[in-house]
Amino acid sequence: MVETQEQPGAIRRYRRIARRIIEHHFGQPPSRIVYKRSGRTNYVFAINHVEGQFVVRISPEPEKTEAFTKERWATQKVREVGVPSPEVLAVGNIGSEPYMITRRVTGSEATHHPRRNHIVHEMGRYAQIINSIRTTNFGANFDWTTNESKNATWSDYLDKEWDFQRRLSVFSKHEMLSSHQIDGIKKIIDDTRTMRIQPSLNHGDLRFKNVIVDDDGEITAIVDWEECLSTIAPEWELSIALHDLTIDEKNSFIEGYGLDLTHVETMSPLIKAFNIINYSNAVEHAAATEDHKSLAEFRLRLSGSLDLYSLTNAARERASA
């Protein structure tokens, strides 16, 4: 996935396309178009129009139509159960380039808002609602698409889409984890194969950067649903949502979700296993680019040496050496 190039010529071209899209959908051109740098694969424009304020996202990648379609399905589903999210008005193509029109959301990214504990408590509450939406099949392709490439079982997802064994081999190849640690993670994941898992909707990246709040710290929208998936919950959701939080914020999220602390303790090994294994792509990228600094930092992080709240296996092994 290549980020959009910040070239004036390309921006002017996509601004003209955005104007055509808006005029096509609303019958008259916008009064103002402002380019919004996204740093991702889309060209994003804020639109002022007599019909309201909108956002147009245009991708140079033809396959992005599926991601936009998925986002429309997910936002409609969660809005039905009271989760604030952007209203997607249209998904289409202009030539080979997909686009999506949404109603503009008011507010700003939650990351630096002073009421973080309040916000994260609400994030937990909304996560529970999102995870209560039952789905069929496992992985990125589920109810939103008629694509027949779906995983009917949890084991299918682990082996085919998530590519569990290959991911584990990354940690061995780059000496991120000991064979004992890898065996332990493998057992945790393999034990889930015999569980009766009812898949449900997971946002897949429910972090501050994907939460929009107003001045009072009230959530106005949860955004970026492209990575949502049908999978086990709440373990998968928590493995990502808790990743960047302080210990107090973790507690607030869990409280907002309504989880019993004993239940969290029971789920903890699986949450940690998901979190660790999802580092495999980052480790591979660092190795491919010969980023030795990042590799060393990943190795330190995955050893548990930065965990100040429990004695990890690695720490106990060093203590007994």
Positions of PLM-derived features:
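Glycine-rich, phosphate-binding/catalytic loops in enzymes
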Residues: 72-73, 118-119, 237-241, 301
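Hydrophobic alpha-helical segments that form the core
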Residues: 271-281
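ATP-binding pocket architecture of kinase catalytic cores
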Residues: 32-153
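An alpha-helical support segment within catalytic cores of ATP-dependent transferases
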Residues: 9-29, 128, 132-204, 214, ...
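Active-site Asp-x-Gly
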Residues: 199-201, 207-209, 213-268
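The feature marks helicase ATPase cores and/or their adjacent C-terminal helical subdomains
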Residues: 36, 199-200, 274, 290-294, ...
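Conserved catalytic motifs of the protein kinase core domain
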Residues: 51, 97, 197-199, 218
